[in-house]
């Protein structure tokens, strides 16, 4: 749901996604092995500040049951009084397929936001279990790990179970996130999650 997989769309595919309605993404597959994505939100508040992320995912290894992809990106905020603010982001993902079509799989992914002494790593494992042509179960375990001395307070772990309706040109994910290992019970025990993707194939 949140973590990427090793899959890249066929060359010439244009795709659009929305996460919880607010977060929007557009992307294009420049080849069978590489795709570019632009992710952001509408302007927030009176100042019109909004987050923006431009990423490139490239498939570097593709066996029948193993996919490995690398990710490079710039991410930041646009519309600040001091000027736009961007940081680099790098990551990778390995996907292990349980069948030839890779309808069911497990993946391990990690990405690092490069902020010097405040560098953060977002890592996790995910599972997709295809039940039928129209249904799949999803499960993720995600962690936020500080690598720098100035980001020690930013850490956490969460579990995200979900359900996917997978079709050829669109898919819908429904699920929720629950924080684990917290000292105090959060006001909202779970956070609902919805993601919708539509793609135009060449």
Regions found by a protein language model. Give the residues of each.
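Transmembrane beta-barrel domains of Gram-negative outer membranes and organellar outer membranes
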Residues: 1-115, 119-122, 128-202
């Amino acid at each position: 749901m949140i973590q990427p997989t090793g899959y890249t769309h066929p060359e010439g595919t244009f795709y659009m996604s929305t996460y919880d309605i607010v977060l929007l993404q557009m992307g294009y597959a420049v080849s069978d092995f590489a795709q570019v994505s632009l992710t952001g939100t509408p302007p927030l508040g009176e100042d019109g500040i909004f987050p923006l992320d431009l990423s490139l995912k490239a498939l570097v290894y593709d066996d029948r049951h193993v996919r490995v992809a690398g990710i490079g990106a710039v991410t930041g905020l646009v519309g600040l009084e001091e000027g736009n603010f961007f940081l680099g982001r790098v990551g990778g993902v390995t996907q292990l397929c349980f069948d030839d079509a890779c309808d069911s799989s497990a993946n391990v992914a990690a990405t690092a936001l490069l902020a010097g002494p405040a560098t953060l790593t977002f890592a996790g494992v995910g599972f997709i279990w295809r039940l039928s042509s129209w249904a799949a179960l999803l499960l993720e375990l995600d962690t936020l790990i500080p690598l720098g001395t100035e980001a020690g307070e930013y850490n956490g772990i969460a579990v995200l179970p979900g359900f996917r309706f997978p079709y050829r040109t669109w898919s819908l994910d429904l699920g929720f996130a629950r924080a684990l290992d917290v000292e105090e019970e959060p006001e909202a025990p779970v956070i609902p999650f919805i993601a919708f993707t539509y793609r135009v194939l060449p």
